[in-house]
Amino acid sequence: MGRVGLGVAVGCAAVTCAIAAALVARRASARARWRRAVALLREFEEGCATPPARLRQVVDAMVVEMHAGLASDGGSKLKMLLTFVDALPSGSEEGVYYSIDLGGTNFRVLRVQVGAGSVIVNQKVEQQPIPEELTKGTTEGLFNFVALALKNFLEGEDDQDGKMALGFTFSFPVRQISVSSGSLIRWTKGFSIRDTVGRDVAQCLNEALANCGLNVRVTALVNDTVGTLALGHYYDEDTVAAVIIGSGTNACYIERTDAIIKCQGLLTNSGGMVVNMEWGNFWSSHLPRTPYDILLDDETHNRNDQGFEKMISGMYLGEIARLVFHRMAQESDVFGDAADSLSNPFILSTPFLAAIREDDSPDLSEVRRILREHLKIPDAPLKTRRLVVKVCDIVTRRAARLAAAGIVGILKKLGRDGSGAASSGRGRGQPRRTVVAIEGGLYQGYPVFREYLDEALVEILGEEVARNVTLRVTEDGSGVGAALLAAVHSSNRQQQGGPI
């Protein structure tokens, strides 16, 4: 071989070696980036861990906060609001009752006909949007609009003899004064009618109804959680609590009046009262908080509030996963050039998170579609898609298990968790059948979430006690439940309803 040929050969060898070295370096870099993504996943999983021992600590913390909230206003993160609902439907109610459900940009009017034996004979529902200008206008404008809608709804009905009872579900913060009255604390959900704050919203509606010539009055002012409890109790008198787990979350339960220390001397016909916990604001150092939860809290308008809700409700689960993906994109390049799209807050909704977690196809085709179409991440390899599924699973599992701990906290406060003497003072006895009414799209529409919650209940309570606890899905407590409460708390309540 001549010198020229030798030089060419040496040059080719050098180029080949350089290319090989570059490929090796690139593969090593890719492996390092992947290892970083896996490390972030493991770190997140460890931070979200909810072993049974930790869940029991959350249970105990919930009970402590419940006691504190019942002892004094402002003494706990849990508001423990009195509802003045001291009787619940028993299934013996009969007649036709109406309800209005106002809790957002739409409102509903319902006519519910009930028969003895826990039978809903007939139900009619109409939904209407509230014009945006009314959400920022005047009190009279809003309530006159609602009253007129009820008047139009009643036209053609033949059950308008005498004064009619109305249940009013008003899902905004209210300081309850009685079962049929309460003053607005503040507007939420885009409403900003200044002259309503501090006024009795039931009285505002009653005045509007009278102005429309309607012989209708509000006999029960409730929130959606209390309505869910009422509907659950209507079907099953062993129902002692209700939980909503949807875009938001809350719980209420039946408390003995002598345990409500902040209202000494409170008397009811039944000796009990429904307490609205507002448990979304629960907090404890035992909750498994991660750096992503802190980032989420920082980007919300209600910073340092609703800590429990931000861990378990549908409004936030997708965003927690998005924050994890964004950090992975920044530190590992596992998503290629998609870091920009992952920087958009709330781009991943919880329904998409659920669809990702529940994709059981061999190649995770639904995950690939969601990544491509909604997160702008094209051609994610299968191992990346599996990583995405795992993140969504971790978020879901933590949320469901914490929700289960909250439910057990209520049961422990009532002495129904099998731990012996009740915190409310009752002695040890045989396990009693206990029903918790549960409503909300996260529990009803996300089977994996439901399975994790049910599994955690058994882990915390033990199989023997858990056999006596039933979570009963209850639909439309805010509508039908409010109408049933109108029946119980109407002028003929002495013939209807039952002790609680």
UniProtKB/Swiss-Prot annotation:
Fructose and glucose phosphorylating enzyme. Involved in the regulation of cell expansion in spikelet hulls, grain size, and gibberellin biosynthesis and homeostasis. It is a single-pass membrane protein. Pfam families: Hexokinase_1 (PF00349), Hexokinase_2 (PF03727). InterPro entries: ATPase_NBD, Hexokinase, Hexokinase_BS, Hexokinase_C, Hexokinase_N. D-glucose binds at residues 188-189, 223-224, 250, 278, 309. Residues 90-222 are annotated as: Hexokinase small subdomain. It comes from Oryza sativa subsp. japonica. This is Hexokinase-3. Coiled coil: none annotated. The gene is HXK3. The keyword Nucleotide-binding applies. GO terms for cellular component: cytosol; mitochondrial outer membrane; mitochondrion. Residues 35-487 form the Hexokinase domain. Belongs to the hexokinase family. The chain crosses the membrane at residues 4-24. It catalyses: a D-hexose + ATP = a D-hexose 6-phosphate + ADP + H(+); D-fructose + ATP = D-fructose 6-phosphate + ADP + H(+); D-glucose + ATP = D-glucose 6-phosphate + ADP + H(+). Pathway: Carbohydrate metabolism; hexose metabolism; Carbohydrate degradation; glycolysis; D-glyceraldehyde 3-phosphate and glycerone phosphate from D-glucose: step 1/4. The keyword Transmembrane helix applies. Its EC number is 2.7.1.1. One of its GO terms (molecular function) is fructokinase activity. It is found in: Mitochondrion outer membrane. Induction: Not induced by glucose or fructose treatment in leaves. ADP binds at residues 104-106, 247, 441. Keywords: ATP-binding, Glycolysis, Kinase, Membrane, Mitochondrion, Mitochondrion outer membrane, Nucleotide-binding, Transferase, Transmembrane, Transmembrane helix. Disruption phenotype: Decreased grain length, grain width, and grain filling. Delayed seed germination and retarded seedling growth. One of its GO terms (biological process) is intracellular glucose homeostasis.
